[in-house]
């Protein structure tokens, strides 16, 4: 506020109108997006300062030891010449005035002996002393300032995804082939066939019994029946005028006909020999090659009966060889005799 002092001679100052107050300026809201700093790429770490390795002190210069002066040369003293020895002077006789003067006889000239110098003095060889090296005093190590390396900034580690291995399928075990040892082939034994005498059939008495037909032979299904045994009809003889005949004997029915081998059983001798050799080594390929061609034209039951007949002719143990023979028939030759087959009794 202005303080006005009333003064009679000072007019009132004119009142200046005040400027109207302007409304405050309102800044519009800034629509600029916020300033985003780009991600700072880590600076490569500076190479650490190269530190020179401590220098090894140089060796001190080689100081030659003082050389000892050689001995002064030996100076020979001057040789003093020897005085020649003068012969003693003979006293001269007094001169005689009356005779001629005798000749003056001079002493013979004696040559001077040569001057012989003494041998030179040989001094021993001087051995130089080894040089003395001063003791090595290493320099004190200079303090090395600590090496301050800038911190190494590693980039962020991004984990690698785990390695998924395919499932391991185990290999199927390889079947090992059975070890088949070659069968021992024995040479065929051809024994002499026993002399078979025909059975002696006694002639029955001539009786006129009533005709009894033979019962039919029961044959299994795969068996091809042999032709029935046709017996000739019994022709009764006319009665003789005899006394009354005795009572007729009991009628015994004839047994059924035994099946026989339709081929020569001796042809299967080689097959039975091979089967006899297979008791200890097991059934092999030789039995198939030997027996199957011989039994090819026979039916199942005939083949088994022929083997039984040949085993009996060979006088072998039928209880041991028959199971082997039946197994060869079924497995190798494709023949199927009746189940629980047994050789017919003779």
Curated annotation (Swiss-Prot):
Q: Which InterPro entries match?
A: Bifun_inhib/LTP/seed_sf, Hydrophob_seed_dom, Plant_LTP/defense-related
Q: Name one Pfam family in it.
A: Hydrophob_seed
| Ranges of compositional bias, category Pro residues | 25-42, 51-81, 89-144
Q: Where is this region: Disordered?
A: 11-144
Q: Which domain of life is it from?
A: Eukaryota
User: What CDD domains does the database record attribute to this sequence?
Assistant: HPS_like
Name the chain's protein: 36.4 kDa proline-rich protein
Species of provenance? Solanum lycopersicum (Tomato)
The beginning of the lineage is: Eukaryota, Viridiplantae, Streptophyta, Embryophyta, Tracheophyta
